[in-house]
Amino acid sequence: MAQSQLAKGSRQTTGRPFQNKPARAARRLVIRAADAKEIVFDQESRRRLQAGINKVADAVGVTLGPRGRNVVLEQKFGVPQVINDGVSIRRAIELKDPVENAGAQLIKEVAGRTNDAAGDGTTTASVLAREMIHYGLQSVTAGANPIAVKRGLDKTAEYLVAKLKEHAKPVKGRDDIKNVASISAGNDNAIGEMIADALDKVGSNGVLSIETSNSTETVVEVQEGMEIDRGYISPQFVTNQERLLVEYDNCRVLVTDQKIDAIRDIIPILEQVTRLNAPLLIIAEDVSGEALATLVVNKLRGVLNVCAIKAPGFGERRKSLLQDIAIVTGAEFIAKDLGMKVEQAVVEQLGVARKVTVANNTTTLIADAASKDEIEMRIAQLKKELAETDSVYDTEKLSERIAKLSGGVAVIKVGAATEAELEDRKLRIEDAKNATFAAVEEGIVPGGGAALLHLSELVPAFKETLTDAEEKLGADIVMKSLRAPCRLIADNAGVEGEVIVQRLLGKPFEVGYNAMIDKVENLLDAGVIDPAKVTRNGLLNSVSIAGIMLTTQAVMVEKHKPSEIPGGMTASGMPSGMTI
């Protein structure tokens, strides 16, 4: 392929248009510049934002709990999708009113932050945020100082997070893992068993990957591979926009400890890989400047499927980790100490990964079957080094490397009879996987909204430590809001939620409402449990967004224009320029 066929990145500059500053005579006005804006102030802005927030929370709220309902999503092509996953529902929501849509985006941000941090709990976080915003706006409308109320929210949340950590129990054995996974997957015991089986095979520090099966059966396979604690350098490399992932099959892998910043460093190897029509993963000390721009441009233009990540670790440990990666993928480590240069690299020096998945902070490599013997030899070498070292630090790091190499990757191959069932099942397994790792990390608490409800009972005592009356309002808002998830779970199960809440108040922390069997019981003993990390992140993110809403005084959005279609016609079918 000629060098000219690879597009070179270039710097672009953008000018900022001058705007005349409008007089703020009215409380609602339109600024006309390159694009007209609508600005809405005070109560109207908060009312319309809240309307958008309520629509999202109502849509995802119906799925909460073991007896939560389904939601039908219209697809651009094919049959509608029937799902019970809050993440997918919130992603699909776009509202016609631009201010309401801004509110919808705010509560979607709560869910997104919670999902990014803990991998689950998006529906609970959305419900919590809606309640805090509802009660908070009531207080502000009645004349409370929003800054003081926000301080009360923040202080109460900080206190409750500390109490939550005190009540969290460590995960003990297979049963706890199975229960966490089952609950997160919508009380699907088969998925719970599957996640427990997978972790039995690779350990709690292992890696789980989810793929589509070629049959209708769902199976767990353990394959050679490893996870790297580094993500993509640029989000422009993303191939799966919904999940913000880079996903490639049969990917070539370049492994080096050198910095790549000049075009000349990478053009030769890019041309060779382009001829193979194969994707490329670059693992280097850094990729920046013209080199990064060139990769991004060629990825966006469809010339080459490529992704770049920074090498994990530091100093000598970085070299060792890169050697591990090279062995897993069958690559030759292009080391600067040996006088090797990236610009002289050839295809034969690249490794191969059967599957590569890159997130914003992790990369999973599933190795080609041919690498198995080399990986076993590397593990044996590391075990020998481990036996000979006296350093506590070296012992820890060598053990970590051995675990990464020997654990492998548990691949859950998901099968189903229909496309709709397949997508729903994959979403449930993804939730179960994320919840399980969150539980292993920070422990478990009673589920069913019970942990949040019992935390609300601790607020009155904490409120007595506050001296500002409006900060106490913030504490009251948190207290009332924390009871909403339990109430909604009961409502979705067909019973009176407020009655259940009153029955649980004053009970021990472990006692809650098991909606699956309509019974108040010890939820830890019953296996109805949630990861403490999910509960913590849901609470903190809800308080954060509620504080933003309470201190919002104006909203500026794009003013909608009639969309035009070819032939000078508007979307309504009338000729453009006509008054309708």
Curated annotation (Swiss-Prot):
The keyword Amino-acid biosynthesis does not apply. Its main location: plastid. It comes from the Eukaryota. SUPFAM superfamilies: GroEL apical domain-like, GroEL equatorial domain-like, GroEL-intermediate domain like. GO terms for molecular function: ATP binding; ATP-dependent protein folding chaperone. PROSITE patterns: CHAPERONINS_CPN60. Induction: By heat shock. InterPro entries: Chaperonin_Cpn60_CS, Cpn60/GroEL, Cpn60/GroEL/TCP-1, GroEL-like_apical_dom_sf, GROEL-like_equatorial_sf, TCP-1-like_intermed_sf. Keywords: ATP-binding, Chaperone, Chloroplast, Nucleotide-binding, Plastid, Stress response, Transit peptide. Pfam families: Cpn60_TCP1. Residues 1-17 have a biased composition (Polar residues). One of its GO terms (biological process) is protein refolding. It is found in: Plastid, Chloroplast. Residues 1-24 are annotated as: Disordered. GO terms for cellular component: chloroplast. Belongs to the chaperonin (HSP60) family. This protein binds RuBisCO small and large subunits and is implicated in the assembly of the enzyme oligomer. This protein shows ATPase activity. Oligomer of probably six alpha and six beta subunits. PANTHER family: 60 KDA HEAT SHOCK PROTEIN, MITOCHONDRIAL. This is RuBisCO large subunit-binding protein subunit alpha, chloroplastic. The lineage of its organism: Eukaryota, Viridiplantae, Chlorophyta, core chlorophytes, Chlorophyceae.
